[in-house]
């Protein structure tokens, strides 16, 4: 932890080096690099004042500085990330409007390993994707999105041009164009095309093209269909989705059919609220209808999930969530998977039970306490015995006055698994504490500290048992 003083100094420095910036629509400072943060209460609050370009048009900027320290008795690693988000109000253009948006990141590894020799083991324990990218890109730049949206410039058409995430049945990230056209009040058609975006692969010759249709059959019924042609890493795939959304009294039902080449899956989900008691019931089903061989696509990139050899399977889930006595709520869910043929590492029979108990407004009005438990029972196969996993934890968050939020929590994970001819049980205990402070509308600060104590490295080196992470964020908003 010898870099802790550096962390404190850098946190202060962030307040002075950040330039003017402003808000985005979702009101949170999370980025694609921090979606895995275990602390959810600590989201930055943001204003929507903007900087005036004209009498009726503003530009909104947000500059977020992030420092991360990871350390144990074996090694230390310090990373610095700088995020910039910008968008404008809609500007009149012809018979419609145009607006612009961008989201970018720059980063550096303060004591990174990319300049060290392979014989210097000290620097390689924390090697990650940032270190790899810095090996060939100074400041590891990433453009998450940067596009112009033309709404109504072409009659009844919304057109996105640039880098963006599709917002149809798939959420592919593209460098290209996406056009949606309304054909009356009931029908919308769309088409898109361009190059897929990858931060890890060479995609010079890769392309993605597709289109779809949404039909509002009745007031409560919508049907959609989408086809995509993927030409990625020299593998050509046909990707088709059909979806039905049906609203019902106090709930909704979704049915979906997906076909990736010859492999088809069916998904169904229903949510219903019992009005008299406030009980929420959720039912889910997923089924792989075809045997998947190695001849099917196994593309590993932001476009599709990995699809390797797999047998047919059925997966079910049922959940219930109930609030009671004004300050309490409890949830319970059961999930099971049944494989119809040969099992492998990623496709095995299992059952799972998870539960949650929440307390709102006790002991004070702005207190939230949540207890959770998650148990997996993974069945044996021809090649392995049955395994178990147990996780439980508690999280507490508290608002302190108008300007501050604090939180703390702990979780425990126990894994039972086969190792050579031995059955092992290893555990991981995590603790975290953090806070968020917003003294004025244009400034928000966050700090989060976590510690992980694990048994997994006992046979390697006990100095790896305890790992610490410190996160410091500064958000300047105008």
Which positions does each model-derived feature cover?
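Residues on the lipid-exposed face of transmembrane beta-strands in outer-membrane beta-barrel proteins
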Residues: 84-88, 145-150, 177-181, 211-215, ...
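Transmembrane beta-barrel architecture of outer-membrane proteins
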Residues: 64, 79-83, 141-145, 174, ...
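Transmembrane beta-barrel domains of Gram-negative outer membranes and organellar outer membranes
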Residues: 24, 62-153, 403-405, 448, ...
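Transmembrane beta-strand segments of Gram-negative outer membrane beta-barrel proteins
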Residues: 26-73, 95-104, 159, 187-191, ...
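Bacterial N-terminal signal peptides
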Residues: 8-18
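Outer membrane beta-barrel
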Residues: 105, 123-198
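Repeated loop/turn-to-beta-strand initiation elements of outer-membrane beta-barrel proteins
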Residues: 93-100, 154-160, 185-190, 219-225, ...
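Outer-membrane beta-barrel translocator/channel fold
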Residues: 73-77, 107-117, 131-133, 192-243, ...
């Amino acid at each position: 932890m010898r870099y802790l003083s550096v962390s404190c100094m850098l946190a202060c420095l962030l307040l002075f080096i950040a330039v003017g910036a402003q808000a985005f629509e979702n009101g949170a400072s999370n980025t694609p690099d921090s979606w895995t943060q275990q602390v959810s209460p600590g989201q930055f609050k943001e204003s929507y004042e903007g900087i005036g370009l004209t009498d009726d048009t503003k530009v909104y900027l947000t500059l977020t500085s992030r420092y991360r320290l990871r350390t144990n008795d074996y090694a230390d690693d310090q990373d610095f990330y700088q995020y910039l988000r910008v968008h404008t109000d809609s500007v009149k253009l012809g018979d419609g409007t145009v607006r612009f948006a961008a989201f970018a990141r720059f980063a550096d590894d303060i004591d990174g390993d990319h300049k060290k020799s392979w014989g210097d083991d000290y620097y390689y324990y924390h090697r990650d994707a940032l270190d790899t990218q810095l090996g060939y890109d100074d400041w590891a730049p990433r453009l998450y999105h940067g596009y112009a949206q033309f709404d109504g410039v072409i009659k009844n058409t919304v057109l996105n041009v640039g880098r963006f995430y599709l917002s149809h049945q798939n959420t592919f990230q593209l460098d290209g164009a996406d056009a949606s056209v309304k054909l009356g009040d009931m029908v919308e058609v769309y088409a898109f095309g361009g190059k897929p975006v990858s931060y890890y692969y060479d995609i010079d010759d890769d392309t993605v093209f597709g289109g779809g249709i949404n039909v509002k059959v009745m007031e409560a019924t919508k049907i959609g269909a989408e086809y995509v042609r993927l030409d990625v890493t020299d593998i050509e795939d046909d990707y088709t989705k059909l979806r039905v959304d049906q609203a019902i009294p106090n709930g909704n039902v979704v049915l979906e059919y997906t076909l990736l080449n010859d492999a088809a899956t069916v998904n169904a989900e229903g949510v219903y609220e019992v009005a008299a008691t406030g009980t929420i019931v959720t039912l889910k089903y997923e089924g792989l209808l075809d045997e998947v061989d190695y001849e099917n696509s196994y593309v590993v990139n932001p476009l599709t999930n990995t699809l390797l050899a797999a047998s047919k399977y059925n997966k079910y889930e049922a959940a219930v969530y109930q609030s009671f006595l004004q300050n309490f709520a409890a949830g319970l869910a059961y999930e099971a998977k049944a494989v119809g043929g040969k099992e492998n590492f990623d496709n095995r029979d299992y059952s799972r039970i998870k539960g949650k108990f929440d307390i709102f407004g006790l002991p004070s009005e702005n207190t939230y306490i949540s207890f959770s438990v998650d148990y997996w029972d993974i069945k044996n196969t021809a090649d392995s015995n049955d395994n178990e996993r147990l996780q439980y934890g508690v999280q507490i968050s508290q608002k302190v006055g108008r300007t501050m939020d604090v939180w703390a929590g702990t979780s425990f994970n126990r894994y039972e698994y086969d190792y050579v001819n031995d059955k092992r049980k290893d555990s991981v205990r995590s603790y975290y504490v953090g806070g968020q402070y917003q003294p004025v509308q244009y400034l928000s600060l966050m700090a989060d500290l976590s510690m992980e104590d694990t048994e997994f490295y006992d046979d390697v080196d006990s100095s790896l048992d305890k790992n610490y992470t410190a996160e410091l964020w500064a958000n300047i908003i105008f």
